Amino acid sequence: MTNAFFLTGTDTEVGKTVASRAILHAAASANIKMAGYKPVASDSTPTDEGMRNSDALYIQDASVVELDYQEVNPYAFEAAISPHLAAEQEGQVIDFDVLSAGLEHLKSKSEAVLIEGAGGWRVPISHTDFLSSWVKREKLPVILVVGVKLGCLSHAILTAEAIKNDGLELVGWVANRINPGTENYADIIKMLEKNLPGKKMGEIPYMPALKNVTYQSILI
C-alpha cells in the first residue's frame, strides 16, 4: 500500500515547499519512489501551456517519479489570494473528488506521495469547506512545517491541537528558520520538542534561495 503524507504549515510563507523539496530529495537518496503533489495553488502565472505555480514546479522537479504538471497541480489559480477567493474569481469549484482522484493516480505510480497543502491548516477552499476537511476525509498522516519566528510556538501548538481534534496524527514536524535574526532560536526548538507530538524530522537553516535546497540541508 502506498504511503501518503500531507504537509502543512503554521502559516503561509513558512517554508512548506523548502521542506517538501528536502523530503523528496531525501526519498530519492534512499531509493524511495516518491511523488510530490500540490493539489491547490494560488499565485500562478499564465503560460502558453496553462497556469504554472512556482512551488508546484519545484515539487515536480524534485519528485522521484516523472510527472506531468497537471498530475502535480490540478488546481492552479492566478490571484495571490486565498484559494477559495481565487477559485471564485475564476468561476471554479475545488472538488474533493478531483483531489482524491489525483492522489489515487499518483499512488498508482509511486511508493509514497508527499502532498503539500496551501497556506495553513485551516485554509478555506470554499465558503463552507477547508482543505483540512479533505485531509480528514482521506485520513492522511500530517507533517507540520514550523516557520521559526516570534510567535511561532503558539501557532505550532494550536495547529497541532487542531490536527488532533480532526482525528488525525501529526507524525512529524520540521523547523524552518525563516528569519536569521530570530533570538533564542535554540530555546524555541526545545519548546517545540517538548510540546509537539510526532518526530522532529529536521531543522532547515535560513536559506534565501530555494534552488539551493537539497536533502543534505535538512536532518531527516
Curated annotation (Swiss-Prot):
The keyword Secreted does not apply. GO terms for biological process: biotin biosynthetic process. CDD domains: DTBS (cd03109). The active site is at residue 38. Pathway: Cofactor biosynthesis; biotin biosynthesis; biotin from 7,8-diaminononanoate: step 1/2. Gene3D superfamilies: P-loop containing nucleotide triphosphate hydrolases. Homodimer. PANTHER family: DETHIOBIOTIN SYNTHETASE. This is ATP-dependent dethiobiotin synthetase BioD. It comes from Photobacterium profundum (strain SS9). The lineage of its organism: Bacteria, Pseudomonadati, Pseudomonadota, Gammaproteobacteria, Vibrionales.
